[in-house]
Each structure stands twice: as structure tokens, then as C-alpha cells.
């Protein structure tokens, strides 16, 4: 059983310039990368050259986050949302991203905002060839965010019914809002496009606290998940000093080879 980990540059080595974070991810044996919205602000030629040189794949990136953490569900802002979605699709496909995360934004959860989000997601799907991800975000982390629970995300996906629309299953957020990770994964497995991990209590390194990832991650694999595990956590100190949490899983890999 092999575990591949994706370095989230929005959190790991955040104190360093963006391209330096990528180099350190390679140096510290990450299999792939995932971005927030950094590619919107840098030279894409330099980025593509570095990704090619380091032979790192890219799981995904975000649309512009802005002050409202996206705006795709905010009524009255669809022109802005669709302009930013189109720009992000162009960038994501140019740099070889597997997926684009469309943030809904901070707005009330009601039928008008639901319809707005659905319309803008349909626009994204029509104008792209890559995976489109939506992510439930817990109230504690981001008060007022439109999409909070995995059931809400699943309802949106059911309404649109498109094979390239999936859920970003962030274990930190799912645990806070919906509880039992494995139960929720099983219930929505066919709708999950990417998994992210962090400690439950403080969003630090994934092997601290109540979530036993040494058990949970192998279970995700046994239940059919084949993707990388996104490391979107807040390091408790220098990023490289806290990477030993991966060691028990690497040991599991070696045990299965014997």
C-alpha cells in the first residue's frame, strides 16, 4: 500500500517565496503539489519550467480567493465569478493542474445562493476539461462561508450531475461539521475527488490529536481512494521539522513490500 503526499503551498513553507516552497517540497520527498491562488500572481513560464525540472505533478489550484474567499455563490457577482473562473481555467490547464477548486464565498445559504453557485459551476464545467472541485469549509475556520457540510456539497453535485464535478474532502473541515470521517467517506465515495489532511484540534501536523491517520489513511485506500493526500495543515514550527509524521506510513509501505 503506497501513500503519496501532496504539498500544499498555501500552508507549507509559507514564509518563503512561492517558487522556493516548490523546491523544498521536492527536496523533502513530496510526490506532488497543490496550490492556493498563487499562480495568478507569478510568471507562468517560470512556474512551468520549475515543475518540469523537478518532475512534480500538480493536483490542483484555486480560483482567486479575494476578501470573500471566492464569490461563485454570491448573488449579484456572477459576472465577476465567471471572469475569474475563466481566467483560472486558462492558468490551470496551462500549468497542467489536474483540478480547479472553485470557492463559493461568504454568503447566506439559501435558494438564491444555491442557484447562483450551480449556475457558475455549470459555467466552469462547460468551459473546462479538468476536474472541478468544491469544498465544504467549517464555520469555526471561516464564519459565514456558503458551503459548510459534505451533505450540502453532495446535494449541489446531485443537482448538476456531471462526472467532472467532485468534492474536496478536507478531513479537518469534515470532522468539524459532519463528524465520522470514514462514515462520510463511504456515504459519498463516488463524489470525492481529492482528500486533504490535518490535525483535528489545531490544524497542525496530521498525526497530532484525535484523528488517527495511521488508521484512517489506509482505510481510505481500502475503500477505493487512489489519489494523493493533500497536506493542508499549519506547521507547528518550521515545516521541515514536523515532517516525521509521514514516517509510520512509509514504514507501512515497506512492510507490505516484504
Language-model region placement:
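Histidine-acidic metal/acid-base catalytic patches
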Residues: 1-29, 41, 52, 87-98, ...
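N-terminal small/glycine-rich loop or linker at the start of catalytic domains
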Residues: 1-9, 59-72
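Short, flexible active-site-adjacent loop segments at beta-strand->alpha-helix junctions, enriched
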Residues: 11, 39, 62-67, 106-108, ...
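Glycine-rich, proline-tolerant flexible connector loops at the mouths of alpha/beta enzymes
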Residues: 32-54, 104-108, 141, 201
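Conserved beta-strand positions in the central sheet of alpha/beta enzyme cores
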Residues: 34, 60-62, 101, 133, ...
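Short loop/edge segments at beta-strand edges and connector loops
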Residues: 37, 134, 169
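Active-site acidic/histidine proton-transfer and metal-coordination neighborhood
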Residues: 52-53, 72-166, 256
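Conserved radical SAM core fold
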Residues: 64-70, 107, 198-204
